[in-house]
Structures are given as C-alpha cells and as structure tokens.
A protein has these predicted regions:
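A short, Lys/Arg-rich alpha-helix, primarily the initiator
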Residues: 2-27
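Short basic helix-loop element that most often maps to the first helix and adjoining turn
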Residues: 20-35, 64, 95-101
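Localized chelating/binding microdomains
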Residues: 21-24, 30, 36, 73-85
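Short, charged recognition helix plus adjacent turn
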Residues: 76-110
Length: 110
C-alpha cells in the first residue's frame, strides 16, 4: 500500500492556484488539453492532474506547463531569474556549509 503524504493547507492551496492559473492560460490561448499536453510532452491525464493541483505531479512538469501558458512563476521585477539565483547562491555561500546539532547532554536532575 502506498504511503499517503500529508501537506499543509497553504501548500495545497498554492498547488490548486497554480493549476487554475495554468488552466486559465490554456483557455485564454484557446488550446485544448490535448494540444497543451503534446506541447509539454506529457499525457492529457497528467495535464488534468496539474490543472487540478494534484501534489503528486513533478514540480518540473508543473513549471514547464506554467511557462508554456504564460504563468509567471515568480514576481516579475527588474531582476531576471538568473540574477535571483546568483543572489540567493551568494547568500547561501555566507552560511555554514554544515549544520551541526548540539549534542549537549540534557541535565534534568534538578
């Protein structure tokens, strides 16, 4: 039996929002499900799952379909995504490479 994954309400709503935005973009372009699925290289059933906000869909597929129909993946501002990536990687470089948990013994003999 497959293990059932649980998600926060916020994550579920975000997936549904992405799905309806994709569906809106597809319909605004007057593309059928079959047409968009062929453009994305996926099955029509997978596209239907994406448009419903199914959390089991691969994030790469969701991003690709969203891009095809013109859904903005991140806030559009003056900085292109490549600059956002570089900026975020610079921030990561300032942080420790390893996160170590403290192994202090708990003193509960009070």
């Amino acid at each position: 039996m497959a293990k059932q994954r649980t998600y926060s309400q916020h994550a579920l709503e975000a997936a549904v929002l992405m799905g309806v935005q994709i569906k809106l973009g597809r319909k605004q372009r007057r593309w059928s499900e079959k047409n968009l699925a062929e453009r994305a290289g996926i099955s029509r059933a997978t596209l239907q799952k994406i448009e419903k906000g199914d959390m089991s869909c691969a994030v790469g597929l969701v991003f690709e379909v969203a891009t095809l129909v013109g859904v903005k993946l991140f806030e559009s501002d003056s900085m292109p995504l490549s600059k956002h990536i570089e900026h975020t990687r610079d921030k990561i470089a300032l942080l420790p490479q390893r996160i170590q948990t403290s192994k202090k013994a708990v003193r509960d003999d009070f």
